Amino acid sequence: MFGTATRESATRVLLLGSGELGKEVAIECQRLGLEVIACDRYPDAPAMQVAHRSYVFDMLDASELEKVIAAEQPAFVVPEIEAIATDKLVELEEQGLNVVPSAKATKLTMNREGIRRLAAEELGLTTSPYRFADNYQQFVEAVEAVSIPCVVKPVMSSSGKGQSVIKSPADIEKAWQYAQEGGRTGAGRVIVEGFIDFDYEITLLTVRAVDGVHFCAPIGHRQEDGDYRESWQPQQMSENAIKAAEYTAEQVVNALGGYGIFGVELFVKGDKVIFNEVSPRPHDTGLVTLISQEMSEFALHVRAFTGMPVNKIVQYGPSASAVILGNGQSENLRFDGMSDALEQPQTQLRLFGKPDINGRRRLGVVLTRRSSTEKAVDAAIESAKKIKIIY
């Protein structure tokens, strides 16, 4: 049963994180008449612009987080980012708070160590070889154990921050320093991963709902500097690889529990899949589903966590997304060239409404549907180039 937003009966959804993914979740909640409260560490974040009200605070501050939850009494708490006081969510969940998909999932996936140990050590899934390190000496030993080339990541970071590849011994000290600067909570523990020889990587959006586990068509993507630049759906895979991917994803989401969508990241080599990471929420590469599916990843997330059946996920055909990336400084961003960017049919545009920029920032995305994924990607890239950012 849902109440009516802004009334005593309101069913409240508290978003922890208010970026572009949270904005789309907020819009889907609004479609169902849910009351949306958006939180983030900075004002005028994208989801705040489509919410009923908002709070600005550091969500790693457990006491502030508890105050907001106590004030709002939400039916659902929906994390959109990792940098949250997850121990407090676990504590409040034990007292009856509904955390999406679960406080356990939010806590485990907040850092790479929890989810890697779950996948490799508890579930026995194939992953890259790995070691953890707390200091430089341990780090040097970890690199030696895993062997060069290897990938270094802070255990707590997102969007590629602090990640680098060690290609020779000369890179070791530089990689350590870069990882220490890139962690979400400052300097700290890192993971050293063996370099994987793979054909491609995918995001398998996996929905855990009241009527079972459902899979979206696999999403391929291209990364640059740790961030996705284009994504496409479906990624062509062998039947055996799809079965292996779905098996791996189902094992992971069932271990994490709760209802919602999970972005399961996998490397694929031939018919084999290697588990990489999982996000217990919509995934940035899944923005393509805004044009590729009857229900986007955001609609699926809301449908699942509110306890409604998913039934069937309908895919519309080869589709792509291309990021509109800003690089500059401004507190008054403007955009031009939209008419040129949208001159072709089956082309859509989303501008995220981010209030400012200081350096590099994802500001929007172009979405396309074509007769093949290759054509869709090319068209999305060309359209994205036509958007002019005025700083």
From Swiss-Prot:
Function: Involved in the de novo purine biosynthesis. Catalyzes the transfer of formate to 5-phospho-ribosyl-glycinamide (GAR), producing 5-phospho-ribosyl-N-formylglycinamide (FGAR). Formate is provided by PurU via hydrolysis of 10-formyl-tetrahydrofolate.
Source species taxonomy: Bacteria, Pseudomonadati, Pseudomonadota, Gammaproteobacteria, Vibrionales
Primary gene name: purT
Catalytic class of the enzyme: ligase
EC number of the protein: 6.3.1.21
Coiled coil feature spans: none
Binding site for ATP: R112, K153, S158, S159, G160, K161, G162, Q163, E193, G194, F195, I196, E201
Signal peptide: none
Pathway: Purine metabolism; IMP biosynthesis via de novo pathway; N(2)-formyl-N(1)-(5-phospho-D-ribosyl)glycinamide from N(1)-(5-phospho-D-ribosyl)glycinamide (formate route): step 1/1
GO cellular component, one term: cytosol
Ligand binding (Mg(2+)): E265, E277
Catalytic reactions on record: N(1)-(5-phospho-beta-D-ribosyl)glycinamide + formate + ATP = N(2)-formyl-N(1)-(5-phospho-beta-D-ribosyl)glycinamide + ADP + phosphate + H(+)
Quaternary organization: Homodimer.
GO molecular function, one term: phosphoribosylglycinamide formyltransferase 2 activity
UniProt xrefs under InterPro entries: ATP-grasp, ATP-grasp_carboxylate-amine, ATP_grasp_subdomain_1, PreATP-grasp_dom_sf, PurT, PurT/PurK_preATP-grasp, PurT_C, Rudment_hybrid_motif
Protein name: Formate-dependent phosphoribosylglycinamide formyltransferase
Keywords of this entry: ATP-binding, Ligase, Magnesium, Metal-binding, Nucleotide-binding, Purine biosynthesis
Family: Belongs to the PurK/PurT family.
Pfam families the record matches: ATP-grasp (PF02222), PurT_C (PF21244), RS_preATP-grasp-like (PF22660)
